[in-house]
Amino acid sequence: MCMSCISKDCDCQKYRSYTIIDTTISNVNLVRVNSGWYKSGLSCETKLIDYDYWIGKYEITNKQFYDFLTAAVKQHKIVLKQHKIICFYNGDDNIESGLFIAKYPDKAIYIDSTNQLRLSNQLANHPVIGVSWFGAKAFCNFYGFDLPQIDEWEKAARGNFCIRFPWGDDIDSTCANFYNSNDPYEPYTTPVGFYDGNYKNSFYTKNSVSSYGCYDMAGNAWEWTNDRFNQSSPYYCGKGGGFNLHNPAHMQVYYVSTFRVKEDNPPLDRTHLSDGFRVVKRIKNHEIFYHH
């Protein structure tokens, strides 16, 4: 029996014979992106993704990442050492296995004087930032997710519409969080889903949701993807722009930025102030997902 479909539009009867997968984390909201055509790049080339997948409705929050860290510490998959949050990466064709910084402590998630993780409740629902690519992958691996590929991210942001931003072609401070956008949290992140068409005290927001139901795909936090700049590059691609981005044009759905994830000499890891992420789960063998 389908206990609780993550997509509010999920037709449980339709998927009765499908396998139900428990994501093991209760508060990651996912929306379904069906296989099909979408518009890609500056020229709006029509491209195909021939499989269905789930993608995060929101960027991963400080609370979600904190919950991951505390659970992973207990399982010895995250280590707190010398005021650092460290994860292990299994390695790939380009990066050797080893220990890497998962995230530097900040005012949202920090390590206290007793070497215990702490969370700022005031920032619990803001996107986690300052996360390394390795930290984002560690979160995904822990819960059975992955980072989205650029194509998956862009389709979820734009659909089959030749538009510059997830909601259309124009941008102003009521649509997204960027540098000097004068939101109530300036000069920092806003809570995920903040731009939903409602007044927040005296600050008016437009509903900046994508056609698939994703929020904050422009501004707030840069989002790590699973794609390298090229096969031998230490740079991975980011999408969407961040709260400290001076040029909103770089928040357009087809824009790709690159971030170095490791150095050739110690320290081998690299984090960036405004880098966060959202998750993806590719659907295989007619799976659907539920959460508690």
Residue positions per predicted region:
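C-terminal motif of bacterial Sec signal peptides marking the signal peptidase cleavage site
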Residues: 3-4
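N-terminal low-complexity, Pro/Thr/Ser-rich intrinsically disordered segments
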Residues: 12-25
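Short, P/G- and charge-enriched loop/turn segments at secondary-structure junctions
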Residues: 18-20, 43-44, 257-269
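Functional-site microenvironments in short loops/helix caps that host divalent-cation chemistry
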Residues: 112-260, 271-273
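Core domains of carbohydrate- and sulfate-ester-processing enzymes
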Residues: 78-117, 174, 182
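A short glycine-rich, aromatic-capped structural motif
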Residues: 22-98, 130-134, 219
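Residues within well-ordered beta-strands of beta-sheet-rich folds
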Residues: 32, 54-56, 137, 146, ...
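Short, structured beta-strand segments at or near domain termini in extracellular proteins/domains
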Residues: 273-289
